[in-house]
């Protein structure tokens, strides 16, 4: 057996008929990709590999045990009786071996490996001759499953064919009581139950369960990209990535969601999408326990805890934890905005941002709270809102342990410990930790007192101080003021004012919990 054929047999992933029936369509497609990729890798490495029947089947889109060529003249009576009584699996098929493998079958005949009735029942042998109509071109019939299918080679082990015809399966696995013809098939099957990874990369030490994965991984170190797209010239280091890329040009989306009929070009995209229906979040942060439906989201989230910022701007050196943040920042240097709103002309550097912006014009609010029915334009707003019902506070201060519902609130709070004051007054140079504090300070320079209390017409510089004079006139707890002259500060978002309230409560030693926490 050639080195290539032996390696393919060693690394090929094999499923029995029973296992195949349990696989989902996406998993079957993944199996096809891996098997075809394994064979392509061996060929690209210059190893002589005679194409196995299973590869031919997969290339034609057939199931691994699809009949390649049905015997027209019937079966040997012994095999036919086994087939009719369903002693064998119903989807097992007959394979005929003829020239140029005739020399092999000739040697098998000399060892008495033909149908067992051939030794004593010459009528059975004559029936074979009559089937083919040519006594000089004998065919040897075997009923075998995909996992038992041999690659006929003049140097193949005679014992292997004996085991096929006698249906002997000497390699058993105690965990599932399954038996196999070959030791390699047993090893592959054991990989389903164990985490053993026998194939190790010599460059970086990374280990893999299957040899085909190692071959694909080694292309990363060598820089080899043997799969090139004829449409655009883009090259890939794995056959599966190449196949997925081709769907960009063809528009093919073979993976469809049964719940909403949305289609995808990759099986992994469908699996991730289905979690939006099931609510499954299998990836959990070890630091704070927050769970995600995609591992990429977990990796990005984890940078909050590690402080990692892997994306650096080449222009100014500023670093970011998200790639999208870097792209957005780069527009400061380029001034380029790719996505423009047709309604108002506002431009954005990300398509997703434009989509969210357009909902302002359409009024669309696709994200609805299941508890109270409130709807939101952006999914992140819904997540923040849901914490009102759940009481979840995923963002915790490492210094004092205080927890917050929003990461922006944690960022503002953390300045109490660091002493950071990023907001500076241009008039006097005084610095503040909160933007809202700077806004209130600037009133001193403008000498504006825009808030008037209607009972005594006393004017104040900001509305929080109206509470005290109000209590002089009545016992009501509600603030009753008239905004006489709205300064520019009214344009600042409510969040800034709420941040100031949070800081004020903390600095005043309030024991009550802030509504923001």
Curated annotation (Swiss-Prot):
GO molecular function: DNA-binding transcription factor activity, RNA polymerase II-specific; RNA polymerase II transcription regulatory region sequence-specific DNA binding; zinc ion binding
UniProt xrefs under InterPro entries: KRAB, KRAB_dom_sf, Znf_C2H2_sf, Znf_C2H2_type
Designated name of the protein: Zinc finger protein 582
ZnF segments: C2H2-type: 171-193, 199-221, 227-249, 255-277, 283-305, 311-333, 339-361, 367-389, 395-417, 423-445
GO terms for biological process, alphabetical: regulation of transcription by RNA polymerase II
Domain KRAB residue range list: 6-77
Any single Gene Ontology cellular-component annotation: nucleus
Lineage: superkingdom: Eukaryota
Coarse class of the protein's main subcellular location: nucleus
Keywords on record: DNA-binding, Metal-binding, Nucleus, Repeat, Transcription, Transcription regulation, Zinc, Zinc-finger
UniProt keyword Cell cycle present: no
Role, per record: May be involved in transcriptional regulation.
Phenotype upon changing residue 345 to E: Found in a patient with mild intellectual disability and eye movement disorder; uncertain significance
Organism of derivation: Homo sapiens
PANTHER family given in the database record: ZINC FINGER PROTEIN (PTHR24390), ZINC FINGER PROTEIN 383-RELATED (PTHR24390:SF260)
One Pfam family in the UniProt entry: zf-C2H2
Subcellular location per the Swiss-Prot or TrEMBL entry: Nucleus
Keyword GTP-binding: no
Annotated gene: ZNF582
Family: Belongs to the krueppel C2H2-type zinc-finger protein family.
